[in-house]
Structures are given as structure tokens and as C-alpha cells.
Amino acid sequence: MKKILSAILSAATAFSMLCTPVIAAENTTPSGIEFANIGTEIEAFAEENKDSYASFAAAVFNGDEILYSKHFGYIDRENNIAANENTVYEWGSISKMFIWVSVMQLHEQGKLDLNADIQTYLPEGFLKKLKYDEPITMMNLLNHNAGWEETKSALEVADEADIISLEEALRKTEPAQTFKPGDVTAYSNWGAALAGYIVERVSGMDYAEYLHKNILEPLGMEQTSVSSDYRDNDWVRAQREKTKAYLIINYPEMGMVMDEDLGTAMSYILLYPAGSVTGTLADITKFAQAFVDDECPLFENTETLDLMLSASDFYGNSDIPKNCHGLWVTEYAVRTMGHGGNTNAGSANLVFDKESKTGVVVLTNQQSEAVFCYGIPELIFGNIENNPIYTNAAITQRNDISGNYVTSRGLFEGMVKIAPCLNYLPLEVSENPDELTSAGMPAMTRFGDNLYLLPDSNDFIYETTTSDGKIMLEYSSMAYIEDDAVANEFTAVIIFAALVIVTLVMLIVKGIKKLAKKYRAIPAGKAVLAGQLARLAVGIVLVLILVSMPEALLVPVCILAAVSGVVCLVSAVFTAKALFTEKDMKKFARVRYAFSVLCNLFTAGFVVYFQLFNFWA
């Protein structure tokens, strides 16, 4: 693929030497493909990756002209139903672009101040888990840096009867605030949905109703639904019920091959503004084209579109934009902006270059699809290695960033505080000082001061620091933050798991001895047994956390962890008392008692440190 792109780029460069730059720009994509050849290139790409898709739809446009649009594959392979112009796909987080357009519309009307405290627009006391005094503004929501951790509660339900109002869903799923507003980028579905709720509050309209009146109808998007249950468009619902979802992974060289039929995979997103929009390729193309229209029908004034497409957040102290009022910036051979989306039933991507007015939309009926959602935009916009950010970069310093990092888009409060240490990023410098590895695998390559390129990707990392001096590796919609304790926390989890296994073995041996009538009572035997059972109980709690237990079990499991921690402490006291008061105790028995005391103290500390008792966070 890279060879093909390289050849195309070389040909385009040679051609540009014979023609004026204006003519070349008007008739080629940013990667150098002539408009007339776009279909040939995409279809060749589809053939090259024919084992990687069930169905996808792609469109390429330039201004108000659609250069290419086609549906590939099947929405129901079992019944041989091919995708067509009536096929609807879930757009996932591309839905957030509708939130941000709505916000900018209300800002244009003078009804919404982007820099005001959002509590101005919310019911009194709505936000109950704020940690910092600094106000959260709409700009923080647009840039995903309000400081919230990930949500712990399920954001979608399988039964339509379980759908609740947007306000109730937000109240029920409010995450803890773990970062100071403006300090750290941490992608937040909850924060985006909160912005959608503010649109409701400010406009006085139901969010879905607002979108239909102010975005869908002006653009002629009649084949698009907004509500989580499709109640706003019966036709879309009927079409959606025909579409199956698939999980296809096709990397045989890595031993990763999977092809699974997921059925319709229909679910109902409670925070629906953040991810429920569903519609056809034609409709999403209309929406995308509006962003490169000089007379954008979304706003009264062209200045509002200009403001929306201007940078609102940057990487560190650089002049490299990260976000443009809710739209993520991606550096291909040219700078683009847009949004990707993923749901249980599909993946999507919308990308455009405001300078050339060229754009791409890709829709699929596949979970976690990346080959087409990211491969086709690269085909059209080229590779970052041809971008001035890359070609003009120079390495004048080499900071040592080796260490352990946790993602800002994580869980840091409550009983799931254990999560970051189970998924942290260890970085080491390889023999080449500009190559970094993680667990022996290539992780990133330095290509400039503070700049690192990810393997086989147009994504890059920018090295900066947090307000408290920790190294922070910024990566588009989130960051990796240096954490000196996370490796020790991971070790503690391993030690505890080992203690649980040892405890289980000891109980089995004890049971066998009792059955064989060879077991002899020991001093403080009940206290020792209670501590062992409590350790097992905490082990069960840990397993339930790791397997994503049902939300209904949250409170009882936390209570079990709390009670078990207390039992371990009490057991430690009585066992220690026996250890020091029983004068005739043999040496081996003393070792066992000391081990029991240490195990109980470790378990109690484990419960407290990882907040396994904390169900209210």
C-alpha cells in the first residue's frame, strides 16, 4: 500500500512540474490522485483488503461536487443482502459533531457563552462530583479537557423499556472529576452529552427536535435518525433492523483472524447526543459538505464557521492544533479535521481538508473497524511523512521519557481504581535512542523535538508536562501521564492474586485433613479461618471487577469488600495475639501465624488503597 501511495505521490509531483499549481490543486486530491481515478484507487484498495470487510460505504467530495460514492459488500451475508443507497449505518461519535454545531449556532445567536461557567446553564447543584474550584466552560467540553474520568456506568441498554431521559441518564452516570479543567485532554462521552443537554436547556427544545429543525431539515437529511430509539424516524429504524453487524479482524501475519456475526447488535445509548445518530451515506455526505461550503447553511454568518474551524486547543506549548471547537485535527500529508465513530454495530469516519475543500466519509457495519475507516482517508489525504510538521521537524534534544504511563481516559476513583495499573504503558528506549518500545514491541519513533510517530500510523505523540511537572504524552483525544506508582500497584495486584491462590490451597488441604480426621485444632483457629475466607471474598470481588460485573451488584460487592477488609484486620489482631501469647507454639507454626497476620494486613490495605469498598464514586 505504501508503495502504491508513494508511486501516486511521485506521479502527482512530476505532473505538477508540467502544469500550474492551481490546475493541479483543482483536479487532484491532497495525496495527488486525479479526481477521475479516485474510484479506481478505492476499489483497488477494497480488493486488496476484501477479507477485511462485510460492508462499507465511502464517498469523496470536493466542495459541492461528489467525486465518488459507492456501497460495498453485504449488510446480511447469511441472507445475501447487499448494501445499497438505502442502507443505514450507525455513525457513532460523529454524532458529537452535531452537538458542537448546535453549540456554535446558539453561540452565534448570543444565547451561549463559550467561556462562561456551564453551571450557569444547568439546574442548581446538577454537578455533584467536582473536585476543583476552577469553572468548567463550554470550551472545556468542546476540547474534552473538563477533567472527568471515564464513566463507570453502562452508557447503553439492550431493552428499549430501560431508556431514560437525557437528564436522568446524566445524573445517574456522572463521573468523578480527576483533572483540573484545561490541564489534560481526556475524551469524554459524558461531557459531550452534557453539552447536548445544555443545548436543550438553552434552546428550550428536545435535543433531537432541535437537530431536526436546525441541522437535518436545512441540509435535506431525511434519512437520518437522532434519538436512541429511532422514534424520530421510522424509516431509519426499519432500515436499521435489516442491517447486521460483524466483528472482522484479519491480521494473519500476527495470528489474529476473526469473523463473527453479531446479529443486528441493536442497543440504545442513554447519553444519546454523544453517539446515536444513524443514517445513510448520502445524508452524512451532505453534512460533511456543509463544512467546506463558503455559504454554509448551518450558520447565519460565515464568521461562525470560520470560528468553529479555527484551533481551540493545541499540543503543549506548540502551534500544532489538536482540536477545532469539537473537531479533531489529524495530520495526513495535509492538515484535516473531523471525527471518527464506533458503536457495537459499526465504525465510521468523517474527514475534510478545509483548504482544498476535499472530504471523505466512510461507514461500516463492523465493530472496531480500522482498515477502511482510516485507510481510505490516508489514500485521499496522503501520509504524515509528507506533512511539513514531519518534513520540517528537527531533533536538537533527546529527553529521556522512559517510564510507566497511564491513560488520562481511565478510571481513577472508586472500586475500579485498580483499572489503570492493569493497563499501563511501559516505555523503554531501544538501542536506537530515537526508538521507544513497550513490552519489547515498537511503540513510537522520535522525529523531532517533543514529537514521536506511532508505528504504521498518521498519529503522533507530543511530549509535554502536566502542571505538577509529570511527563505527559499527548495523543489527540487523550494523553499518557507518567505514573511512578503504577508498576508497584501492578505488583501488588499480582502478589494479592498469589495470596488468594495460596489461601485457596491451604483451605483445600485443611478440608482434606478434616475429612481424614487428621486435622488438629490450633489457637485462634476461628480467627485464622475467618481471615482466609475474607481473603477469598476479596479475591472474588477482584474477579467480578475484571469481568465487568452487572451494575446491580455494585453496592453488595463493595459492602462485601468492606466487610472482608474489616474481618481481615480483626483476624490479624487475634492471630497476632495468639502468636505472642502461645509460649508452646512450634517454630513452623509461628511462621504460619506470622504469614497469616501479614496476609490479612496486606488484604485490608489492598481493599483500602484500591477503594474496593467505594460504591458512591
Name these PLM-found stretches:
Residues K3-A83, Y89, Q105-L112, N143, ...:
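N-terminal leader/targeting segments and the immediately adjacent pre-domain N-terminus
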Residues E26-H71, H212, L262-K513, K518:
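Catalytic loop of the DD-peptidase/beta-lactamase superfamily, centered on the K-T-G motif
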Residues I38, I42, W91-S95, I99, ...:
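Hydrophobic (often cysteine-bearing) scaffold residues that line and stabilize catalytic clefts
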Residues D51-A57, N79-N140, Q177-W190, Y272-G275, ...:
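Short active-site loop at a secondary-structure junction
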Residues D76, L130-L350:
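Short, surface-exposed loop or secondary-structure junction motifs
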Residues D459-D484, L536-S564, F606-Y609:
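Membrane-proximal extracellular juxtamembrane segment immediately upstream
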Residues A497-L507, Q532-V543, C568, N600-V607:
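Canonical alpha-helical transmembrane segments of integral membrane proteins
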Residues T503-L536, E582:
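Juxtamembrane interface at the cytosolic side of transmembrane helices
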